Amino acid sequence: MTLASMIEDIARRARTAARPLATASADTKNTVLAEIARGLAHGKREIEAENQKDLKAARDSGMSAAMIDRLTISDQTLESMIKGLNQVIALPDPVGRITGAWTRPNGLEISKRRIPLGVIAMIYESRPNVTVDAAALCLKAGNAAILRGGSEAFFSNTILARIIGNALETVGISRDSVQVLPVKDRQAITELLQQEAYIDLVIPRGGESLIRFVVKHSTIPVLKHYKGVCHVYVDETCNMDEAVDICINAKTQRPGVCNAMETLLVHERIAPLFLPRMAQAFSAAKVEMRGCPATLAMVPQALPADETDWSTEYLDLIVSVKIVKDLAQAMAHIAVFGSDHTDVIVTDIPENAETFINTVSSSMVGVNVSTRFNDGGELGLGAEIGISTSRLHAFGPMGLEELTSTKFVVVGKGQTRQ
């Protein structure tokens, strides 16, 4: 079987599996998720052994520490996967939910109901926990899933796929409801992106090059999880202790994730007091600073930033720093270099906070908080499949509801159109 025919067969089987899955009860879907959680707990040693194969290859290839962190399945990661499954079980099933109902003057009773999207293909990098998260959310929303993780996580994703398949089979649901592409060949992605006859939506989640590749080659609608060039703007008046804490958390808690801060913008009036303190905190946290000329004058140990730094998602302990004249210049910078992901203002001026909220168009705009809160769980939405930077269909964290669509149901008593 050629690669092209293998990928088409996987997509065809996913489409076939999606039909009965769309009408599966909430109890049935929750039972599958509980079985996956049980399988993860029982398969801990085997999962860790397969993950070690990926980690060894990553270290041998010189992968960065931040990327290795994303690739690692620790005890904590496994517990987080199981916790995530239980959280999805606890969420209400969106399928069949009536989002609106009304009666027309001619007596027609009209309702709008949530339905599964169908077959979702997800293409992502590094983090094998995404395999479990994506499978859980797609299944709970009644969708079949085709998953293609990064080749660097091949062994980890393969064992996770087996556990998911076993859980499906135990409950009497087709294993084809969740499939992980069984090959590392990048051409498999290209072939997958041509299966518009069977796949309804593609969700890429990874670096800029992956997103651009998917958008360029897909004949299927794409919901982008684009890069996170996230900003914190420190306004002319603010609580500087809070500002330092926010910036350290936003940059260092998990530097390799999409909602980490990449650029710090500082008002010129507060910069002489704030930046030396911030630089000291960054230095203690081993964060490399890359600054504009005005920043370098105040922080001699910083490296000079060039134009590419302002649009770079470092995913590492690096931050670009720019001193701006005022709020307007900060927002203009974000409009040019931001990625519509997450942007925050730290300020004591309510009018400036409101202007920032109304002007900046990112999927999460924050006031006096860390960028790290742009997350489905932290926002109280439950689990998420990613953070969409597309405005069509979904914008921001994508939970269960964002993995469904709607249909109209019209009930009459023999009415005909006049």
Swiss-Prot record:
<dbReference type="InterPro" id="IPR012134">
    <property type="entry name" value="Glu-5-SA_DH"/>
</dbReference>
<dbReference type="GO" id="GO:0055129">
    <property type="term" value="P:L-proline biosynthetic process"/>
</dbReference>
<dbReference type="Pfam" id="PF00171">
    <property type="entry name" value="Aldedh"/>
</dbReference>
<keyword id="KW-0641">Proline biosynthesis</keyword>
<dbReference type="InterPro" id="IPR016161">
    <property type="entry name" value="Ald_DH/histidinol_DH"/>
</dbReference>
<comment type="function">
    <text>Catalyzes the NADPH-dependent reduction of L-glutamate 5-phosphate into L-glutamate 5-semialdehyde and phosphate. The product spontaneously undergoes cyclization to form 1-pyrroline-5-carboxylate.</text>
</comment>
<keyword id="KW-0560">Oxidoreductase</keyword>
<dbReference type="GO" id="GO:0050661">
    <property type="term" value="F:NADP binding"/>
</dbReference>
<comment type="similarity">
    <text>Belongs to the gamma-glutamyl phosphate reductase family.</text>
</comment>
<comment type="pathway">
    <text>Amino-acid biosynthesis; L-proline biosynthesis; L-glutamate 5-semialdehyde from L-glutamate: step 2/2.</text>
</comment>
<keyword id="KW-0521">NADP</keyword>
<dbReference type="InterPro" id="IPR016162">
    <property type="entry name" value="Ald_DH_N"/>
</dbReference>
<dbReference type="InterPro" id="IPR016163">
    <property type="entry name" value="Ald_DH_C"/>
</dbReference>
<keyword id="KW-0028">Amino-acid biosynthesis</keyword>
<protein>
    <recommendedName>
        <fullName>Gamma-glutamyl phosphate reductase</fullName>
        <ecNumber>1.2.1.41</ecNumber>
    </recommendedName>
</protein>
<dbReference type="InterPro" id="IPR000965">
    <property type="entry name" value="GPR_dom"/>
</dbReference>
<dbReference type="InterPro" id="IPR020593">
    <property type="entry name" value="G-glutamylP_reductase_CS"/>
</dbReference>
<dbReference type="GO" id="GO:0005737">
    <property type="term" value="C:cytoplasm"/>
</dbReference>
<keyword id="KW-0963">Cytoplasm</keyword>
<dbReference type="GO" id="GO:0004350">
    <property type="term" value="F:glutamate-5-semialdehyde dehydrogenase activity"/>
</dbReference>
<dbReference type="InterPro" id="IPR015590">
    <property type="entry name" value="Aldehyde_DH_dom"/>
</dbReference>
